[in-house]
Design a protein with these regions (language model features):
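Short edge-strand/loop segments of extracellular domains
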Residues: 145-149
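Active-site capping/gating regions of soluble enzymes
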Residues: 121
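Intrinsically disordered, low-complexity polar regions and short flexible loop motifs
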Residues: 189
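Glycine/charged-rich beta-loop-alpha catalytic/anionic-binding loops adjacent to active sites
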Residues: 103
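A short, structural motif
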Residues: 1-83, 87-100, 110-118, 130-139, ...
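Conserved catalytic-loop aspartate of Hanks-type protein kinases
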Residues: 142
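Extracytoplasmic, non-cytosolic globular domains
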Residues: 124-129
Length: 191
């Protein structure tokens, strides 16, 4: 434990943060059973994003965990995910915290239905910026929409009689087609 304290103190100094903030950020990653090296990488990204967003490291570590657990496939750096949220927060009337908090609500279902991280983050930032609804409201609404489409994608008819065909017709009226030429449902990124 004393070795961890020394290492955490050194890492915190290098990142211009407190040892307490560093350990708060790393706790969730250790609880996930990650290696020391992986915890150090994730904690560094977490501390940097927390500093940029003006948010606590504990909150940011929870938010990034939801994003990484659902979108990270090794093809991009861990830092990339934080950079996208920070850039979108700077470019829109949304904040990094709003984007991360909203993504936390629907990340698990977003990837399942073919929604990329970039589109998920962009959709959330756009809706939050334009409506000024909270990230909880927007994230939960997107989760509900995606869950319904996923269920319908599997052939289910909802208790209110809603079917994929009904959704398809409503979207077609506003010029959005959800089907590929071969009849398969498009990935969410393409819809």
């Amino acid at each position: 434990m004393s070795r961890f304290a020394v290492e955490a103190n050194k890492a915190a100094q290098a990142l211009s943060t407190t040892t307490t903030d560093y350990t708060n950020a790393s706790l969730i990653f250790y609880q996930q059973g990650l290696s020391d090296a992986e915890v150090a990488k994730r904690t560094e990204v977490t501390v940097k994003m927390a500093n940029a967003a003006g948010q606590s490291t504990q909150v940011v570590s929870d938010q990034l965990t939801a994003v990484w657990n659902n979108f990270y496939d090794g093809s991009k750096s861990l830092e990339y995910y934080a950079d996208v949220m920070t850039a979108l927060g700077a470019a829109t009337a949304s904040s990094t915290d709003e984007i991360a908090g909203g993504l936390e609500k629907f990340a698990a279902i977003g990837q399942t239905i073919g929604l990329s991280y970039e589109y998920a983050a962009s959709a959330l930032a756009t809706i939050t910026a334009n409506t000024r609804q909270s990230e909880e409201v927007v994230g939960t609404a997107l989760k509900t929409i995606f869950a319904r489409i996923q269920g319908l994608n599997l052939g289910e008819t909802l208790e209110d009689g809603t079917s994929l065909n009904k959704y398809s017709q409503a979207l077609q009226k506003v010029g959005i087609s959800i089907f590929e030429q071969n009849g398969e449902i498009k990935k969410m990124d393409n819809i």
